[in-house]
Amino acid sequence: MTCLFPRALGSLALLMVVLLVQGELHVKPGGQHREDGTALQLAKRRYKREWVKFAKPCREREDNSRRNPIAKITSDFQKNQKITYRISGVGIDQPPFGIFVVDPNNGDINITAIVDREETPSFLITCRALNALGQDVERPLILTVKILDVNDNPPIFSQTIFKGEIEENSASNSLVMILNATDADEPNHMNSKIAFKIVSQEPAGMSMFLISRNTGEVRTLTSSLDREQISSYHLVVSGADNDGTGLSTQCECSIKIKDVNDNFPVLRESQYSARIEENTLNAELLRFQVTDWDEEYTDNWLAVYFFTSGNEGNWFEIETDPRTNEGILKVVKALDYEQVQSMQFSIAVRNKAEFHQSVISQYRVQSTPVTIQVIDVREGISFRPPSKTFTVQRGVSTNKLVGYILGTYQATDEDTGKAASSVRYVLGRNDGGLLVIDSKTAQIKFVKNIDRDSTFIVNKTISAEVLAIDENTGKTSTGTIYVEVPSFNENCPSVVLEKKDICTSSPSVTLSVRTLDRGKYTGPYTVSLEEQPLKLPVMWTITTLNATSALLQAQQQVSPGVYNVPVIVKDNQDGLCDTPESLTLTVCQCDDRSMCRAPIPSREPNTYGESSWRLGPAAIGLILLGLLMLLLAPLLLLTCDCGSGPIGGAATGGFIPVPDGSEGTIHQWGIEGAQPEDKEITNICVPPVTTNGADFMESSEVCTNTYAGGTMVEGASGMEMITKLGGATGATAALGPCSLGYSGTMRTRHSTGGTLKDYAAPVNMTFLGSYFSQKSLAYAEEEDEREVNDCLLIYDDEGEDAAPHSPTLSSCSIFGDDLDDNFLDSLGPKFKKLAEICLGIDDEAKQAKPGPKDSGSGADTCARSMEVPQSGSNRYQTLPGSLEVTQTGSKICHTLSGNQETSVMSTSGSVHPAVAIPDPLQLGNYLLTETYSTSGSFAQPTTVTFDPHVTQNVTVTERVICPLPSASSSIVAPTELRGSYNMLYTKETCSHL
């Protein structure tokens, strides 16, 4: 046990040694390695020293052959074998050739020629040792042969003459120039070290300069250089090598003294004076001479003249003559003797260049007085002010400038100070011919529009010259006008509507402003309506919403149609477009979805603003046709017979005069008061008549209007049924003497939506009085409890408290409710008589009742009409002649129109009451009212033809107003009525009015 421990310890130590050895063999060194990675140990070889000796130095420009051999080469291999020595390089096999040679057997190198160091400072010789096979046994060596320098080259200056300059009054030790010289000898050697010195100075005298020995810098020695005394210096400088003891060379230096502004200019005179006529200009009134000692024709010598006082009105200018340095006094603004007789001002002078710092503190402004005497002369005309600026008003387009008046620019009489007379104005310079001036009033206006590409516009301004020529003296005065024109907006913003159609219930729409050039013409935009030339009511308004939109809305209720709304848009630079933009807007009736119910017709009656239109071929043709008709009208008038009678009647031989006393009312003519008024009786309505349960007009009222030659029946719907009368052949017997040869009747009916034009005619007031009296009695007898308010009230106003269904005369009064009857108080006897006739108190009129007369040459007018329903239907039978057939007790009214004198008779009263005859089949009790007119109307007599099934119980009442002898008072029953029974004829003839 005791020996195991030592054994184990020894084995462990042996193992560690093996591991250490194995680890050393595999360490990777930084040197060479085998393929297995182990280090390769190289044996170190000891080399011998160089096999050539150093060469001896050679001196230039000497014979160095006595020093041969200058070098020797020897190889250790020559002991064992034959060695051959060879050399090569510059001076051997390169130029210069043959300077060095070698002995091939022993290796001695010899020099054979004189060398120059400046050409070849040193020689490099390549030495080789070769065996018998011509192989190098030694590594080739380089042998250096140095050439020693000798002082054989003098210094050389870079220039023969050096030129320099320096300002006068410069401080001492100021650098003037640096001289440059070189030496070809060995650098950094005494042979090439140069020393400089000044040999001489011209002009001689006090030395003004010095030079640095080593650097060659020439500097000032003093600060007293003065160009005005000596303007340049000439120096001779030498340079010697070997630090001044060797070879030397000389050069020249030319130094110019530069001028500085160290001399003040001084005027030669202490004061100046001159004379000049008023209102004249002078380019050279005076010359000022100045003395300056600085260099001529330089800024230091050139004088600058200026005013120190007295030229506040800028009447004078001083210009310097560059050749003589004199100041030239010019009169650039005319002097007025009436304002100033003498001008005093002061001038001073300085140089164009600033004064030198050495004397600037000594400068003082010296003012010299100048007096100008103004000579009085007879003055002419001039423009005051000499220029005038006009501005085109904002909003005026550049293409609407023709005729635009800018204003006037008149010349002034200098003697009176007022506008000159006997002056003719013309335009001198007028680029583009845009303007024109009135030769008498000097009014200026545009005659051409401005093009945006015009080259005559400079900074938005047009300039022109105005000449005023005195017609007495021939003198001319010139003035300049400037016209500021509106700016052009080449990128006008456009206005876009949110929608084209709007509703009448909400007439508004949003406008949006857009532009293509976003970089220049940006918002905010201002949208406004174009100002209307006429004083029209404002229909639209614009309210700004934001920078690019606005609200267009109607200010009042608008009707459907198409509207053109011109608007003006301003950009952010307040620029306007040349023309306003017109927006087309359609206003329509909308449904619940705010959509137009029906399209708006293409016609635009409600166009707002200006609309473009043109004449078509049809319109042009109509215009030409109208002109042709105007030319033919005089020819047609020559063929007209103005005295012919009415249609269908005999000629009367001329116009029938209106007889006196035929008027039935009192009119206010021009000599009595205001304009005549229409006093005809309004419509008297007839209530519906019922026969066998059938209404005539189906719950509508029937109103009759009597016109010349026809009867009109009005319904509640506003339509008029017109019955016209005409002659027919082959008819039955005539009715009375009014037939005048007619034997039949023809009935024509049609309806129209309007009314015929009424012609005012006088009314027989006597008949109306009796009629209304009888009607009042009839109402009183029919219904006792009914209030009697339908009596003869010519000027009465029944008021608004009448019963709704009670008959009134408010609508049948021949006078208006607001008629003032005070004018009756001033009427004469003639009108008093007429008033008695109208009131029914004229006894003479009642007693004068002439008998009926036969038909004469005059034309009787019989306007009879009768509407009788046929049994079993609601058809009507018309009896020509304005015959009113109504039910007994019903309301009757007859409207009088046209050129007729008409009267109406009712069934009640004391005249001829209607007789009711019962009829078992149809409703009887009819009243036939016949009306005659004999005032000259040309209505034709008619024949009454009854239907075979007409009512048999008829009461016929006849009343004739017969102011003419041709009126007839008899009635002849037609053929159909002669066999009838229960027929009552009543005749009443009125007296002449």
UniProtKB/Swiss-Prot annotation:
Gene Ontology BP, a term: homophilic cell adhesion via plasma membrane adhesion molecules
Residues of the propeptide: 24-49
The alphabetical list of record keywords is: Calcium, Cell adhesion, Cell junction, Cell membrane, Cleavage on pair of basic residues, Cytoplasm, Glycoprotein, Membrane, Metal-binding, Repeat, Signal, Tight junction, Transmembrane, Transmembrane helix
Organ and tissue specificity:
Expressed in the basal layer of the outer root sheath of the telogen hair club, specifically at the cell membrane between the apex of the cells and the surrounding hair club (at protein level). Expression is less abundant between the lateral margins of the outer root sheath basal cells (at protein level). Expressed in epidermis. Expressed in the epithelium of the tongue.
Which sites does the entry annotate for glycosylation? Answer: 110, 180, 459, 546
Q: Which residues form the Cadherin domain?
A: 50-157, 158-267, 268-388, 384-495
The membrane topology term of the UniProt record is: Single-pass type I membrane protein
One Gene Ontology term, aspect cellular component: adherens junction
Enumerate the transmembrane spans. 618-638
Q: Which residues lie on this side of the membrane: Extracellular?
A: 50-617
Location of the region described as Disordered in the Swiss-Prot/TrEMBL record: 845-876
Kindly indicate where the leader peptide sits in this chain: 1-23
Q: Where is this region: Required for interaction with CTNND1 and localization at cell-cell junctions?
A: 641-714
Q: Which GO terms describe its molecular function?
A: calcium ion binding; protein dimerization activity
Q: State the Desmoglein repeat repeat positions.
A: 905-930, 931-961
Subunit relationships = Homodimer. Part of a complex that contains DSG3, PKP1, YAP1 and YWHAG; the complex is required for localization of DSG3 and YAP1 to the cell membrane in keratinocytes. Interacts with PKP2. Interacts with CTNND1; the interaction facilitates DSG3 localization and retention at cell-cell junctions. Interacts with CDH1; the interaction is required for CDH1 localization to developing adherens junctions. Interacts with RAC1; the interaction is required for DSG3 translocation to cell-cell junctions, organization of cortical F-actin bundles and actin anchoring at cell-cell junctions.
In the record's own words, the domains note is: Three calcium ions are usually bound at the interface of each cadherin domain and rigidify the connections, imparting a strong curvature to the full-length ectodomain.
Role according to the record: A component of desmosome cell-cell junctions which are required for positive regulation of cellular adhesion. Required for adherens and desmosome junction assembly in response to mechanical force in keratinocytes. Required for desmosome-mediated cell-cell adhesion of cells surrounding the telogen hair club and the basal layer of the outer root sheath epithelium, consequently is essential for the anchoring of telogen hairs in the hair follicle.
What protein name is recorded for this chain?
Desmoglein-3
